[in-house]
């Protein structure tokens, strides 16, 4: 059984609690809880999603409203509270599965289980670009497919799935994932997450999230109007077959508490 309302899409959680460390802070969240920036000088501001999933296949999008200096990260976090992250330590790094950017020309693709903060080692791979695309910047839409049952992730930019060395990604056909990980090691709930750094004297990065509620990203671009295979969502680009919008209608619910199945 699945929950009835399709209107409850994942947003960014303004009520998320700061961690105990100064490098575990919730950023500023605006525009219907979909737009985020750090708001904390010389720190990453983190924004986690309201919906977590342990299993399934999910499609999400991020829009780079402002490509700030020096870095940002989008993806998923294994855990239910923001963790310590400053870009130079290994604490909690293994709990991220993400695409990130650090000033220069590199995309970083990081799977669950990575503990490296140095590009090119321990599965943290730097790419001057995907071999078929450039580094994403202001005005670009980042696409992501996650298969939490198989431990695979795909990333793309502006409607084109990235090639990180083995051919262009093809999530619909389970081909050429950009990232893989051991499912059993990260079996608990995962939440979408966005990180932005704010640095004095530089442009601050701003990113807008779309779990299927608004393909215009709060009016920043023209609508896409693409739904998932169940008919839910409004995405800029079409979700690959089998990958769903992160909304209540696509989340399983036990018959024991489903109003449609109980007598109460």
Where are these regions (language model features)?
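PRY/SPRY (B30.2) beta-sandwich protein-interaction domains
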Residues: 1-264
């Amino acid at each position: 059984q699945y929950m009835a309302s399709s209107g409850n899409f994942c947003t960014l959680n303004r009520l998320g609690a700061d961690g105990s460390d100064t490098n575990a802070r919730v950023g500023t969240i605006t525009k219907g809880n979909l737009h985020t920036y750090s708001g904390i000088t010389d720190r990453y501001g983190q924004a986690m999603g309201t919906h977590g999933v342990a299993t399934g296949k999910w499609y999400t999008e991020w829009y780079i409203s402002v490509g700030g200096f020096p870095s940002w990260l989008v993806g998923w976090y294994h855990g239910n509270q923001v963790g310590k992250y400053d870009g130079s330590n290994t604490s909690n790094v293994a709990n991220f599965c993400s695409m990130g950017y650090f000033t220069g020309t590199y995309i970083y693709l990081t799977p669950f289980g990575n503990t490296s903060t140095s590009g090119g080692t321990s599965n943290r791979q730097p790419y001057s670009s995907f071999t078929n695309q450039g580094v994403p910047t202001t005005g670009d839409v980042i696409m992501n497919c996650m298969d939490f049952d198989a431990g695979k992730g795909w990333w793309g930019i502006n409607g084109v799935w990235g090639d990180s060395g083995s051919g262009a990604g093809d999530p619909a056909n389970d081909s050429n994932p950009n990232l893989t990980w051991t499912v059993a090691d990260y079996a608990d709930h995962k939440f979408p997450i966005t990180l932005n750094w704010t640095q004095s004297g530089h442009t601050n990065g701003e990113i807008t999230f779309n779990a299927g509620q608004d393909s215009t990203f709060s009016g920043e671009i023209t609508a896409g109007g693409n739904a998932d295979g169940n008919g839910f969502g409004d995405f800029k680009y079409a979700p690959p077959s089998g990958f769903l919008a992160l909304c209540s209608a696509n989340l399983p619910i036990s018959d024991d508490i489903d109003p449609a199945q109980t007598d109460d």
